[in-house]
């Protein structure tokens, strides 16, 4: 069922919101890991998810699950409902179980779509905590801009962020903030690499 959804959703997205994945090989790490990416559009989860042939899971605000048909659709696509207003223990347990079962988990650590024009909003600490608790890699990605119909967009896959110093240790508030900062730097660095790629691409055309 997932592969059917994947095929038709990607067909729709690529037809109306074309995009190119740069450095896709960096996403081909075996085993579970957490993907962190900036968040600009409702199509972001499909763009990021298309980096993987196997099913990847991602957090999705619980409001999308109010209607049975939508809840069924998003659940089939790997969505995990989360309450953004407070600490959602059930979502946390589901995420931990997902990673422990060897799956990939996509998180947009800004917590909402960025409509400010800034490169990133404040980064929440959940992604780093999940990765540290399960001892998995964190792979940063960066989307160039908000998706617009028939306008090509770009997604850059960065190299893993090293958080191994936190594996097997208690993650207190200070560690959570340090992990969030590492993730912030990793996403921004990946964005810089995307800009460099696009500049080089322009230079070759001249």
Question: Where in this protein do the model-derived segments appear?
Answer:
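Catalytic core of membrane glycerolipid acyltransferases/transacylases, capturing the structured
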Residues: 27-86, 94
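Glycine-rich, highly charged phosphate/nucleotide-binding loops
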Residues: 20, 87-91
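Soluble or luminal CAZymes and related metallo-dependent hydrolases
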Residues: 4, 87, 175, 179
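Structural signal for conserved beta-strand scaffold positions within catalytic alpha/beta enzyme cores
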Residues: 23, 58-60, 81, 140, ...
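Membrane-anchoring hydrophobic helices of lipid-metabolizing enzymes
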Residues: 1-34, 43-44, 52, 76-79, ...
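Non-catalytic C-terminal accessory region of glycerolipid acyltransferases
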Residues: 92-206
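Short, flexible active-site-adjacent loop segments at beta-strand->alpha-helix junctions, enriched
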Residues: 25, 39-40, 52, 62, ...
């Amino acid at each position: 069922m997932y592969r059917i959804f994947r095929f038709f959703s990607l067909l729709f997205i690529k037809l109306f919101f074309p995009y190119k994945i740069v450095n896709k090989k960096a996403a081909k790490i075996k085993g579970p890991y957490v993907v962190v990416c900036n968040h600009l559009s409702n199509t972001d989860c499909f763009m990021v998810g298309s980096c993987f042939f196997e099913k990847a899971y991602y957090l999705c605000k619980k409001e999308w699950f109010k209607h049975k048909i939508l809840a069924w659709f998003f659940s089939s696509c790997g969505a995990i409902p989360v309450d953004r207003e407070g600490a959602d223990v059930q979502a946390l347990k589901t995420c931990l179980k997902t990673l422990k079962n060897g799956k990939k988990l996509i998180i947009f650590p800004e917590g909402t779509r960025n409509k400010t024009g800034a490169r990133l909003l404040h980064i929440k600490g959940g992604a780093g905590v999940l990765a540290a608790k399960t001892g998995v890699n964190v792979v940063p990605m960066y989307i160039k801009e908000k998706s617009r119909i028939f306008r090509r967009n770009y997604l850059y896959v960065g190299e893993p962020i090293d958080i191994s110093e936190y594996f097997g240790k208690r993650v207190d508030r200070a560690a959570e903030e340090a992990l969030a900062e590492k993730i912030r730097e990793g996403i921004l660095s990946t964005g810089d690499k995307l800009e460099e790629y696009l500049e080089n691409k322009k230079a070759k055309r001249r």
